Amino acid sequence: MGPEVLLRLDRDGPEPLRAQLEGGLREAIRAGRLRAGERLPSSRELARQLGVSRGLVQDCYGQLYAEGYLTARVGSATRVAATAPARPAPAPAERPAAARLDVDFASGVPDLAGFPRADWAWAVREACRTVANADLHYGDPRGDRTLRRVLAGYLRRVRAAVAEPADIVVCTGFAQGLGLVLRALSRSGVRAVGFEDPGYGQGETLAAVTRLGIEAVPVPVDEGGVDVAALARTGVAAVVLTPAHQSPTGVVLAPDRRHALAAWAADRDAVVVEDDYDAEFRYDREPVGTLQGIAAGRVVLLGTVSKSLAPAMRLGWVVCPPHLTEAIVEEKRLSDRGSPGLDQLALARLIESGRYDRHLRRMRGVYAGRREALAGALARHAPGLRLTGLAAGFHAVLHLPEGVREADVVAAARERSVGLYGMSDFRMSGGTTPGQLVIGFGNLGEPAIERGVAAVADLLTGKPGGHAD
């Protein structure tokens, strides 16, 4: 009995098709209707049988593979795992160990206490007061038209982007936005995509790329940003970049490379996916405009409020080149029925009112103070160490002395209840040389920064001699 007989998808129901398909397959496996070792149809065949996109089926298979329900090997069929779980894995009872650290220098975390609660509450009230009844129905998969209009104006004004409301797709953050773009590219025949190295490392982002059947190709980064000549040698037809503030090195893509990248995309008929990471927080000068602004027809621009407001917001956007808009909108439509409508309208009100800009100005001051606190603490407790990437964002790169092993420092710091994170986490190879640490300070007050640096200073310098309590 094949899955096409076991599954019924309700296209008019409130549950997204992907969730229905995943749930139906899980239940069929747990109930024994799909037995251990049984072969499942290919993603292409099941998509045809169910009348859904192949990308949706690939995502479902990938999720169930990760949960242990399915097995697959390159060149062979997807099958029900011999030891498929009898029930979904229970949710963890507590936060990961990092939550118990006294000082956690994790990168990518903004000041959670700085979330503008009063302004957001005002924006939500305004959204509820002014929303039209018709806008409470299922809407355009691109997102709320008011937010798309406001975002287009904001991105043109602040990021020098070429943005029209019709070409903006609202999503639930960077992960979904990138997934939409990559699925659209995959459907057009793209099989390999370049990624900055160091960049996303071996984490969830690249695992998701692999599940789509796309090869992630490393492209080296140096002090000028991504190496465009090396990119050209890979032969890929798409690349994902963080040009405004490279994650994690903190460098800005050099002007000559910006133009070389635009020329490469035009000559290769390639697509550049621009992750506008940390662009709001620049300390030494005005932020550089988007790459999309000089090559709009070749660049997909991704942005979110996860760093500017809070990760829990789950709101982002994709500014599509016109030739990709329809495909990306279709992927969004197949993924879900759209992002939360009232939250979208509230964000539009927050931006229109000027409260969002005011919040960003305030947070720039907060992060600038913490940036100075980090540099000062290192100068006092571990003088002579090189710190780079401080011109923007809320993390920096600490270069360890020769002979000091990154992994040893990370492990020993954790014994002292301090979370440190090596550059190896961000390298696709996992390599640990040269030894570097990515030091996040966004969610740490200045006293915690001082305390954390003092606690591990001897580890950083490789000169044992005790540490401050």
Sequence positions of predicted segments:
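Residue-level detector of anion-binding/catalytic polar loops
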Residues: 70, 215, 271, 418-419
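Helix-loop "lid/cap" segments that line or gate small-molecule binding pockets
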Residues: 107, 151, 317, 345-353
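Hydrophobic residues in well-ordered beta-strands that form the structural core
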Residues: 195, 218, 274, 347, ...
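Active-site PLP attachment segment
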Residues: 293-327, 339-342
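Conserved core of the PLP fold type I
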Residues: 124, 129, 134-268, 280-282, ...
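N-terminal basic, amphipathic alpha-helical segments
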Residues: 1-127, 136, 145, 188, ...
